[in-house]
């Protein structure tokens, strides 16, 4: 749709937007004419038939009448003309860029719309509109630059750290200088948030050389501890070793080097690697553990090769009845001892696979040795070996049963391995505490132990109560009846 020249002039005279011009001079006369045209354009929004209802404004700055009525009419009719104005805006795209009226003109209506009063004026337009709903006629200003910072990533180190702490996504690539990166790290440390510190350290690890990173972290112990923990978690042993070497932490360097054996699967290669760890500067306690680890793996390799040969030959009874379910290689010391007690219990002390040899070589405590050997021999139901395990002789040749782990634990392990009642009763009787003995005997149905204990306690009432728990007509019931009818026992109740 083509517009005539008159329509275009009417639009620019009536619109609150101004056409683009290259003339930057502040012409007082042109501003005055513009203001006059803007005021006269208000007449188009009201009924021209009634001249008495139209208030006029003189150009001397003094109000002739109330202009608020005209503005109300303008606000009421603005809705009907909104669609036409939108079409005009779409046709003139450059009109969306509003130019602020220059404040040099005393009578500029834009100054009235902003609520400003020039010196010497009697009444501002904002005062005249005080009884009407507020409506902004000023050109829309551009959004502040700060609202677009999410897109430009124009954040300071402190702002970036706060955003990271809140879980917001932001790039750290804009921090390119060493000073900015270190300030970013210091801000992260001051927040006391481990996740933020780790995120910044990952960025520094990727963008800084090792020498610069280690040098700066040496004087920042909090960040240094976080980096060490992070490297241990991700398994970056090479960088961790370089860091400890730079910090001259020999013991931690040795431990990190020792930890690398976990990545070696071949037993022979792992043994050779552990041999190189023996001479590293560990503490006295750690050095003993490293030596034991090397010796144990060396023994396991020998035992594994020998037992694999015996098992494949099929000439050894223990391997035929109980085939091996797993290899002994890289197993803990206690597991190796159990394996030795299970398959090599009767071997001479001089062999590597002998349980006694393992006990002496690795200084295994008596309690640990007895507990492991008992579990292994009870699983095989080798009750004679169990009995020999607790039988000791004094210097006079008398035998006595002694258990470093306590006979109550012996009873529980035997019951777990389905030991016969006669075996259980023998070891229940060896429990010294009476209450513990009665509880175990009742729990595992060792009736003879319960009956004999109540007899020794001369507790007739408890014996009568226990009589109802045994089977009718059983040997235990007959034994209880014989004790109750005996005149040689002086019952206490």
UniProtKB/Swiss-Prot annotation:
Pfam families: Vps16_C. Belongs to the SPE39 family. The modification Phosphoserine is found at residues 121, 124, 130. Residues 142-152 have a biased composition (Basic and acidic residues). Interacts with VPS33B. Associates with the homotypic fusion and vacuole protein sorting (HOPS) complex; impaired by VPS33B. A possible interaction with VPS33A is reported conflictingly. Interacts with RAB11A. The modification Phosphothreonine is found at residues 21, 117, 132. PANTHER family: DEFECTIVE SPERMATOGENESIS PROTEIN 39, SPERMATOGENESIS-DEFECTIVE PROTEIN 39 HOMOLOG. Disulfide bonds: none annotated. Residues 68-99, 123-152 are annotated as: Disordered. This is Spermatogenesis-defective protein 39 homolog. Keywords: Cytoplasm, Cytoplasmic vesicle, Differentiation, Disease variant, Endosome, Phosphoprotein, Protein transport, Spermatogenesis, Transcription, Transcription regulation, Transport. GO terms for cellular component: cytoplasm; early endosome; endosome; Golgi apparatus; late endosome; recycling endosome; vesicle tethering complex. GO terms for biological process: cell differentiation; collagen fibril organization; collagen metabolic process; endosome to lysosome transport; intracellular protein transport; intracellular transport; peptidyl-lysine hydroxylation; phagosome-lysosome fusion. Changing residue 213 to P: Disrupts endodsomal colocalization with VPS33B. It comes from Homo sapiens. One of its GO terms (molecular function) is protein-containing complex binding. The gene is VIPAS39. The lineage of its organism: Eukaryota, Metazoa, Chordata, Craniata, Vertebrata. Proposed to be involved in endosomal maturation implicating in part VPS33B. In epithelial cells, the VPS33B:VIPAS39 complex may play a role in the apical RAB11A-dependent recycling pathway and in the maintenance of the apical-basolateral polarity. May play a role in lysosomal trafficking, probably via association with the core HOPS complex in a discrete population of endosomes; the functions seems to be independent of VPS33B. May play a role in vesicular trafficking during spermatogenesis. May be involved in direct or indirect transcriptional regulation of E-cadherin. Residues 68-81, 90-99 have a biased composition (Polar residues). It is found in: Cytoplasm; Cytoplasmic vesicle; Early endosome; Recycling endosome.
